[in-house]
Amino acid sequence: MSVTDPSTAPDPVRDPVTNRRLDHRLTYALLGLGVFVVLVVYVVWQTYPNYDTYYTLVWGKELANGHLPDYDVFRTPTPHPLSTLVAWVMAPFGTASDRILVLLSLFGLLGFYVVTFVFTERLLGRVIALLAVAVMVTRTDMQLLALRAMFDLPFYLMIFGAALLELRRPRCGWPVLLVLALAGLLRPEAWLLAGVYWLYVAPTTPRPLLIRYALLVAAAPVLWLLADLIVTGEPLYSFTSTREVSGEFGRNRGVGDAIRSIPNFLGGNDRIVTVGIGGLGLLVAVYILRRRALLPLALGGLGLLTFLIIAAGGLSVIPRYLTIPSLLLSLCVAVALGGWRLIAEPTARKVAIGIAIFSALVLAWRAPYYVRDYQKLADQATFIEAQHKGLKGILNAPNAVPALQGCHPITVPTHSAIPIIRYETGLPKEAVEASIGQRRRPTQGVLLIGDTFNFEPSAARATNSNPSTSARKRWSNKVLPGFERLARRKPWTAYGRCP
């Protein structure tokens, strides 16, 4: 008898114990690979936080020194209570905290991939979950968030984490609300999600427990208002200051413009795939899941509603507020590719196979664009590394340090470099000025001149804004008469004129 005779040969596929062992080995192997990739990226691409995160680190240092954060700065970013608390925890690490935060953010991205994998696997199985992670890896916009240690990334992780908790145990209750409360201390969109979830669990929850749930729902907005009141004396400071900055950059364009922007903003880094193929995958997912599709549909629908509420409130109409629906559409791309495997009805299965073939052809056509996306991401990372290392080098150059400490103002081309200088040197806000905010050209102090006017790579700057005039002044990023060269650290040069 042949050793391959199916009547006698063991079938490891049918052995549940063997299956579990293989699953565990595969899981550990993939996690190990993910950790390895994170460490390689951290070493190869030595990036730094963005403008908002650096100001958060400055505020954390102020808290650690026993002072309230000073939000009254030129073009202040919106303060977020939880991110400021994290910055306070990071303060003992000194000027190493920026790179530590980038490393934590990269691990946060890995955690996000894990959560989206488990979320998709619970709904649609392992094959589609693996496809979903593969699609997510093409989202270079998400990877840029991690490389810049932006606090948007942990927010998305928490939102999908809360959805996963609910998916694993319907009407989960306080664990979901606790995660949403933490997310609500990073971005107010979670307030609406928490409120709607409370209404969802209310019919089946005893009144005493429902009251405790209500306290969790109210926790994030109350703590945010209280933080603003303590720091500024204005409980609505975050809202009013954000609206003012939005108006300054021309981002508050109203509900009409917001609606017209939805298809573009949903697209992430590839509107054809995310909106087009993702839209087809959404139809397949709804057909497969039926009632089980309500949770992701509600999550995406509330994301759209929040975006419109933000627009109606005069706040920024920018892509970040549609990221949750956009990410859900990216998951649907995986359904478009593999959903046919879960459909038994012949006609529907043929349609799903047709969608899968069409989707695969579109992805093959778009493959070169993904290569360009990664090339662009690498260029951005290289630009960020050069800018920050050069600036930090200038700030520590022996010939420049005395002038930087005692010869003010320090003038930089734009506001983008100000929080980095304050973070590195500990100088007060009055010591550093952006040329775009000056009424007249400086006659003394230190000029920090860059090889380029913009401190940030193009994709890291605000998009879709319509400023009426350029903020650049005639003297911006130029050597002025009477200033002498102090030091050069490519791409930065310091010039000084001290009385």
Model-derived features: where do they sit?
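Signature aromatic-anchored transmembrane alpha helix within multi-pass, membrane-resident enzymes
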Residues: 27-32, 178, 214-222, 277-280, ...
